[in-house]
Amino acid sequence: MGSSSRVGDENSLLDLTEKVAVVTGANSGIGLYILFHVARAGAKVYLGARTEAKFNSAITRLKTEGLDTSKVVWLPFDLSDPRKAKESAKWLLERENRLDILINNAAKILGPYAQTSDGLSDSMVINHMSPYLFTKTLLPLLESTARQPGSDVRIVNVSSVAHRWVPNPRYDSLEAFNNNFADTWKPKTNLYGYTKLANVLWTKELQRSFDRANIPILAMTVHPGNVMSEGNVKLFTSLMFGTIINWVFSLFFISPFDGGYTPAFAAASRVIAEDRRKYAGAYIVPFGVIEEASEDARREDLAKDLLATTDAVLKQYDYA
């Protein structure tokens, strides 16, 4: 399917009028179009972006796509420090009495390994620890919404097929979290995949916790597809014969609009509403298909290690 394809019948999503949603990293790329699909269905949507300038730029682009942006609100959002992520969640808690949809989309993609000022892998902070704490802080609001009549609360964590490519993953220590994969063939890809595997493990454990407590919330992970995103365009252009490479990949990659559909499907599809248990903890690929996640992603021991270490690190650095 070429990058010019347009998928996603708006009638395939529930009517989200009177519903409240959050989409992080929604000022560009896939996130912009996740928000487009959800907002088009009628929801009030908080657009997570680091600056108001980025928010305003996104609004301009959404308007050119024909979206009524009157119910799109800026959520000041920065994943570079878990404290900032928690502040964003608390900011939202002060302003809303319900939250129906949370889509954790913001992420660091294939950048070089780096550490935060606290000496932590910035990829793990941005892609896992900050979204984890952001979500944890919002759980009371999500749970109270889920108990209201007629509610259909969903948490969608955007992962990647790269979660399948991690060699011998461990999450049992801070040292494991800080692995730079320098001794592997593709360190950047493996580092990214390591964080995306964490997304799947966390989501499945989150669903198990909801099920144990009989809380009617769905948690799902999504691979949005191989998307001709702005980041990929820049990456391909930077290579030798970049123009040709961009053209070739555009024949096989999908557009950001199409890439935004599968996360929106997970967040608001009528199909899921009709068979919620089928999708509980599911890993979903384009365009709304359940696929079995990797063997490592299904390991409960890895999930328990991940959450134990995450909570310990958040406590150690006084983030929580």
Swiss-Prot record:
Q: What is one GO cellular-component annotation here?
A: membrane
Positions binding NADP(+) in this chain are: I30, D78, N105, K136, Y192, K196, V227, S229
Enzyme Commission numbers on file:
1.1.1.-
Pfam family, any one: adh_short
* One term of GO molecular function: oxidoreductase activity
Biotechnology: applications noted: Melleolide sesquiterpene aryl esters are cytotoxic secondary products with anti-cancer potential. Armillaridin shows therapeutic and radiosensitizing effects on human esophageal cancer cells. Armillaridin induces autophagy-associated cell death in human chronic myelogenous leukemia as well as of hepatocellular carcinoma cells. Armillaridin can also inhibit the differentiation and activation of human macrophages and thus might have potential to be developed as a biological response modifier for inflammatory diseases.
The alphabetized UniProt keywords are: Glycoprotein, Membrane, NADP, Oxidoreductase, Transmembrane, Transmembrane helix
Q: How does it sit in the membrane?
A: Multi-pass membrane protein
Q: Which family does it belong to?
A: Belongs to the short-chain dehydrogenases/reductases (SDR) family.
Q: What is this protein called?
A: Short-chain dehydrogenase/reductase ARMGADRAFT_1169971
Instruction: Identify the species of origin.
Output: Armillaria gallica
